Curated annotation (Swiss-Prot):
TM regions (residue ranges): 15-31
Organism per entry: Saccharomyces cerevisiae (strain ATCC 204508 / S288c) (Baker's yeast)
Species lineage: Eukaryota, Fungi, Dikarya, Ascomycota, Saccharomycotina
Name of the protein in its database record: Alpha-1,3-mannosyltransferase MNT3
Gene name, Swiss-Prot/TrEMBL: MNT3
Example of a GO cellular component annotation carried by this entry: fungal-type vacuole
Sites where a glycan is attached: N34, N168
Keyword Glycosyltransferase included in the entry's annotation: yes
Length: 630
């Protein structure tokens, strides 16, 4: 009996020894794996480190802390978790995260739980304020980029449902959405109504019913962007217009009728931009021109206080980019005139490849942004920790060498970030696949709301490509510089009697063409001067200048009110002949120059003059007359 008892004790002792050996081996193996993972991170030493309040910075420190704990702490976490600073479950999660062995759902849940743990009061609305302290403004911008990319990684591109991921979590998915996108209407799990704009058919005056959804309203609202994108259908034109833009939009509708357009229009508003009188005028013209026009009132999906405080002027365009119901659309300013059908833009190879097509602005080399803006934007790039944990990558970033000659997009990036050139994109017409580019559009909206970044760019123009860039998306920019159309003039003969060979066009319009010299669209309407009362204002401002050239106000007014006479197009080489701004049309008129052997369509050494066939000129000027018809 005694021998049997001793034998059992010996077996039990050996079993305990074996279990402890296995446990220690596991700890050593785990530590070695984590060291390997840490070494991988150190390979990216040239990349920036996450800011102190970053969720990824906290997670990395937590991993280091767990790895450095002594054996007793590890045993305590396993056998006596209530005495440990970290649970065994968290230790396993951190190890899996470091070795990229974790399920995305668990990773995403942990990332956002950490976000709330670091700062229970975090809110992206903080970026809309300008603190005028670089450390504060830049840190908020950095956190904004990190949070939006994390949200995209998990719930937009990642296609996880936040209402399911956070079902048993300390994070409330509705609260997360409220803080991530402060412009959205504040919702909670008790919401009984599906978030949807009020849409009115302006030709009939009837409301368009909201679609039926196959889920509870709280679930729909708690994963709003994925559900919104899922219900977006078809193609169309999208605008946001103020009262002053209504006469221009009516002209645009008449041009669309002339061009036999068949796509619908959606005018997207925050709720109160248009008067009843303006709505009636649009409705009447829509019926006359047989164009389908819808008014999309977003007051039901926007936070009223935030919208009234921060959404104005250029920010309204982002409301239009996000809250139209199309899958693909062409975003237009009211004074844009297309000369090709919508299929041209949607079938463009560069658009089909990237999902968004932008066009270049005039090249103005003497207008620049600020170095402090570049320093701020560099902080928006993914940190080394973010790259490690969720794999964020950008097409271009400040830590990688690249050639500005590889693409138009690379050239624009180089000229903005290295040369500080301010103007690159004309956002009067943008072609967008919303299903593919939603995360970039959300990034753009939030960047354009940023209190500091608003001081770095002109309006919304550059934010279109910057938003896609920092969302990790690609984008396409038409390679032809912004140009000018109008009557072609030749400089006087030289002193020796020979022709100067220099041609110029002066007008207020920005024209856009393709690599085959085809005129695509114009920004600025087709009136010689679109600025109301400009003749009177010009004479009042510079009486001697305008009297010496035009005699009196009535003559200048007749010139300004005339239809633009199009004879040709010039794409200037600004390194030889920069754009010249002149005093006409309240300083809105520019002149561009090109030299060459007569009116040819060849690419000239010093700028390019494009002339049109008789058929092309007839069509272009018919559109000009249509635009200017009463």
């Amino acid at each position: 009996m005694l021998k049997s008892l001793k034998s059992r004790r010996l077996i039990l002792k050996r079993l305990v020894t074996l279990l402890l050996s296995l446990f220690f081996s596991y700890l050593i193996f785990s530590a070695s794996r984590n060291v390997t993972s840490s070494n991988k991170l150190n390979n990216h030493a040239s990349e920036r480190t996450a800011v102190e309040s970053s969720a990824f910075n906290w997670i990395e420190k937590r991993q280091h802390q767990v790895r450095s704990e002594n054996l007793m702490n590890r045993l305590s976490a396993y056998f006596l978790p209530f005495l440990s600073r970290s649970s065994h479950k968290e230790r396993v999660l951190l190890r899996q995260l470091g070795n990229n062995e974790i399920a995305k759902s668990d990773k995403c849940r942990y990332i956002f739980e950490v976000l709330y743990k670091i700062d229970p009061d975090w809110d992206n609305a903080q970026t809309a304020k300008f603190y005028n302290v670089d450390g504060v403004d830049n840190t908020l911008a950095s956190l904004l980029g990190e949070r939006l990319r994390s949200y995209d990684y998990c719930f937009l591109s990642g296609q996880l449902d936040p209402t399911a991921i956070f079902a048993n979590s300390t994070v409330n998915p509705h609260d997360l959405q409220n803080r991530m996108f402060p412009f959205l209407k504040k919702i909670n799990e008790e919401s009984k109504t599906v978030m949807w704009p009020i849409i009115t058919d302006m030709t009939t005056g009837e409301a368009v019913p909201a679609p039926e959804v196959d889920m509870e309203s709280s679930n729909f609202n708690g994963n709003f962007w994925s559900n919104w994108n899922r219900l977006s259908k078809g193609r169309g034109f999208v605008l946001t217009i103020a009262e002053k833009d209504v006469p221009l939009f009516l002209k645009q509708l008449k041009v669309m009728e002339f061009s036999k357009n068949e796509l619908p229009f959606q005018i997207v508003s925050t709720g109160n931009e248009l008067s009843a009188e303006s709505i009636a005028k649009i409705s009447e013209t829509a019926k006359e021109t047989e164009q389908r026009v819808y008014l999309v009132d977003c007051s039901t999906v926007l936070d009223t206080n935030f919208a009234n405080t921060y959404i104005s002027f250029f920010q309204n365009k982002w409301v239009a980019t996000l809250f139209n119901t199309f899958e693909e659309y062409i975003l237009l300013d009211a004074d844009v005139v297309p000369f090709v059908g919508s299929d041209y833009f949607f079938d463009s190879p560069s658009y089909r490849e990237s999902g968004i097509l932008l066009f270049k602005d005039r090249v103005m080399e003497n207008e620049q942004t600020f170095q402090y803006c570049i320093e701020m934007l560099n902080e928006v790039e993914p940190s080394a920790q973010e790259r490690r944990f969720i794999g964020s990558r950008l097409v271009f970033d400040s830590s990688l060498p690249f050639s500005s000659e590889t693409s138009e997009e690379a050239s624009v990036y180089y000229n903005f970030f290295k040369k500080l050139r301010l103007h690159h994109v004309d956002s009067g017409l943008v072609v967008v696949n919303k299903l593919e580019k939603l995360n970039g559009l959300l990034m753009s909206f939030m960047l354009n709301l940023d209190g500091k970044l608003q001081r770095c760019v002109y309006g919304d123009k550059e934010i279109f490509w910057l938003g896609q860039l920092y969302a990790g998306q690609d984008y396409s920019i038409n390679p032809v510089d912004g140009s000018i159309i109008g009557p072609v003039n030749e400089e006087p003969e030289n002193d020796d009697g020979h022709k100067s060979g220099m041609y110029y066009i002066c007008s207020t319009q920005i024209a856009h063409s393709d690599s085959k010299n085809r005129l695509l669209w114009v920004n600025g309407g087709l009136k010689t001067c679109k600025i109301s009362n400009s003749a009177e204002d010009d004479f009042g401002r510079e009486p001697e200048y305008f009297k010496s050239r035009y005699g009196d106000i009535s003559k200048l007014k007749r010139i300004y009110d005339a239809s633009l006479n199009v004879e040709g197009l010039i794409v200037p080489d600004v390194s030889v002949h920069p754009w010249m701004q002149i005093k006409e049309c309240s300083n809105y008129m520019y002149c561009a120059y090109a030299t060459g052997d007569g009116h040819t369509n060849s690419e000239l050494d010093e700028g390019r003059l494009i002339t049109f066939t008789e058929k092309e000129l007839r069509y272009i000027n018919d559109i000009s007359r249509t635009w200017n018809a009463n």
